């Protein structure tokens, strides 16, 4: 038996204090990590609901447990909404993460040892696209492509490697690539070698939903995404397809192969986020995300910093810190002291170790959710440049921190 009236602060003050401190940090710091965002109060309410109590192995109307009549409604709402959002014929909303969604896609049509062709982690790809340290690189024969000398995705190399290695699956998508990806070109290459085309649009999904980035669904055999990042939902994953060809294989890859019971409270939160993304206001949000990122990149160039690929056409870009004689690790720490949160990130052909790096990754999704516009983005990018110009000057960091505080107070995350 548990108390029905005791609060978290009363029962576990240590944990409550840590949560309160994190809430304060989110309010007082500007979030520029490209994979992070703020969910709405409605999303949090759904995720904190009584649905966390319910086991529901299986799929709507095909459960292995009783009492699922209402969670069936919840999951079907999520399925229908995400299909409408991306123009998909099939959707699985049960993956606990984007990584598990990707694993399920591989497992649905590949066998261990099959060849996959994905973007190199060192050039902006993702761990789950065949990196040697990831299960995708251990189970499958992973071949990687990258960027050309202009730091643009090298489609000629993709085609050459595809013709040479005859992969069973080509993987497109990235975690640190600023430019738009040509899905039609990938489809053309995949068709030349009879490969499945799989796109992981986790970073770009919110922009796709808002009409600010090309939709990969019409071109692909499989599409996955996380539900957080630019899509602004809870942490989780989704699988989408343009038709129902692989429905049975994908469903069984998630359950019972990779997962047991779905997280119904998270699926409810996904449903809320999908409804939010279907609203006209979300299109304006996605547009502003791109504007803010472009403004920041342009301002940083004016301050003498180099942007990988020269510009951004999305929410994200990499800053090459080598001309500044500072590592990504040091830059992340200095910016953190000024209450600007970024992540260190490898740049193409980075001479530094992955935990040090020569770059930082900047994203505009979270700041835009707070209400930052292009004027604020211009101010913020100059504050970033001020820190990078004098990363060890405590007086400089304190000055920037004060200016960041003023910006944050202007745009509270959840307060009024």
UniProtKB/Swiss-Prot annotation:
**Pfam families in the record, alphabetically?**
SHMT (PF00464)
Gene Ontology biological process terms in this record = glycine biosynthetic process from serine; tetrahydrofolate interconversion
The entry's keywords: Amino-acid biosynthesis, Cytoplasm, One-carbon metabolism, Pyridoxal phosphate, Transferase
* Annotated site residue numbers, Plays an important role in substrate specificity: 228
Report the main location listed first in the record.
cytoplasm
Q: Which PROSITE patterns match?
A: SHMT
What GO molecular function annotations does the UniProt record carry, in alphabetical order?
glycine hydroxymethyltransferase activity; pyridoxal phosphate binding
For the ligand ((6S)-5,6,7,8-tetrahydrofolate), the binding residues are 121, 125-127
Q: What is the annotated localization of this protein?
A: Cytoplasm
Give its E.C. classification number. 2.1.2.1
How is this protein annotated for GO cellular component?
cytosol
Q: What InterPro entries is this protein classified in? A: PyrdxlP-dep_Trfase, PyrdxlP-dep_Trfase_major, PyrdxlP-dep_Trfase_small, Ser_HO-MeTrfase, Ser_HO-MeTrfase-like, Ser_HO-MeTrfase_PLP_BS, SHMT-like_dom
N6-(pyridoxal phosphate)lysine: which positions carry it?
229
**Named cofactor requirement(s):** pyridoxal 5'-phosphate
**SUPFAM superfamilies documented for this protein:** PLP-dependent transferases
Q: What pathway does the UniProt record associate with this protein?
A: One-carbon metabolism; tetrahydrofolate interconversion; Amino-acid biosynthesis; glycine biosynthesis; glycine from L-serine: step 1/1
Q: Which residues cross the membrane?
A: none
For this protein, what reaction is catalysed? (6R)-5,10-methylene-5,6,7,8-tetrahydrofolate + glycine + H2O = (6S)-5,6,7,8-tetrahydrofolate + L-serine
| PANTHER family associated with the record | SERINE HYDROXYMETHYLTRANSFERASE (PTHR11680:SF50)
Function according to Swiss-Prot or TrEMBL = Catalyzes the reversible interconversion of serine and glycine with tetrahydrofolate (THF) serving as the one-carbon carrier. This reaction serves as the major source of one-carbon groups required for the biosynthesis of purines, thymidylate, methionine, and other important biomolecules. Also exhibits THF-independent aldolase activity toward beta-hydroxyamino acids, producing glycine and aldehydes, via a retro-aldol mechanism.
Quaternary structure and interacting proteins, as annotated: Homodimer.
**What family does the Swiss-Prot or TrEMBL record give for this protein?**
Belongs to the SHMT family.
Protein name in the entry: Serine hydroxymethyltransferase
């Amino acid at each position: 038996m548990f108390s029905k009236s005791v609060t978290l602060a009363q029962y576990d003050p240590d944990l409550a204090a840590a949560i309160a401190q994190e809430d304060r940090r989110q309010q007082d710091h500007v979030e520029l990590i490209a994979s992070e965002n703020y969910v709405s109060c409605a999303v949090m309410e759904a995720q904190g609901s009584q649905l966390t109590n319910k086991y529901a192995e299986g799929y709507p109307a095909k459960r292995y447990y009783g009492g699922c009549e209402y969670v069936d409604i919840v999951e079907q709402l999520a399925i229908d909404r995400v299909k409408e959002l991306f123009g998909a014929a099939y959707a699985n909303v049960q993956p606990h993460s984007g990584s598990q969604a990707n694993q399920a896609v591989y497992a649905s049509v590949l066998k261990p040892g099959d060849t996959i062709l994905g973007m190199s982690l060192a050039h902006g790809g993702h761990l789950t696209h065949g990196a040697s340290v990831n299960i995708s690189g251990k189970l499958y024969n992973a071949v990687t492509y990258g960027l050309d000398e202009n730091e643009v995705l090298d489609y000629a190399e993709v085609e050459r490697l595809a013709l040479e290695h005859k992969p069973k699956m080509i993987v497109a998508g990235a975690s640190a690539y600023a430019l738009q990806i040509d899905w039609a070109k990938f489809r053309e290459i995949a068709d030349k070698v009879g490969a499945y085309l799989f796109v992981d649009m986790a970073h770009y999904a919110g922009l796709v939903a808002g009409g600010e980035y090309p939709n990969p669904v019409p071109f692909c055999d499989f599409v996955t995404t996380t539900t957080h990042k630019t899509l602004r939902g809870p942490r989780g994953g989704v699988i989408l397809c343009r038709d129902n060809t692989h429905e049975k294989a994908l469903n069984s890859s998630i359950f019972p192969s990779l997962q047991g019971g779905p997280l119904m409270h998270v699926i409810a939160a996904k449903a809320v986020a999908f409804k939010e993304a279907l609203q006209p206001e979300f299109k304006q949000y996605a547009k502003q995300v791109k504007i803010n990122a472009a403004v920041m990149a342009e301002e940083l160039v004016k301050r003498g910093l180099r942007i990988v690929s020269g510009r951004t056409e999305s929410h994200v870009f990499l800053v090459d810190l080598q001309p500044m004689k500072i590592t990504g690790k040091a830059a992340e720490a200095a910016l953190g002291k000024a209450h600007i949160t970024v992540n260190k990130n490898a740049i193409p052909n980075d001479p530094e170790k992955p935990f040090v790096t020569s770059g930082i990754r900047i994203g505009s999704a979270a700041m835009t959710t707070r209400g930052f516009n292009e004027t604020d983005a211009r101010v913020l990018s100059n504050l970033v440049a001020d820190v990078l110009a004098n990363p060890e000057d405590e007086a400089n960091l304190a000055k920037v921190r004060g200016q960041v505080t003023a910006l944050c107070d202007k745009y509270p995350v959840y307060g009024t």
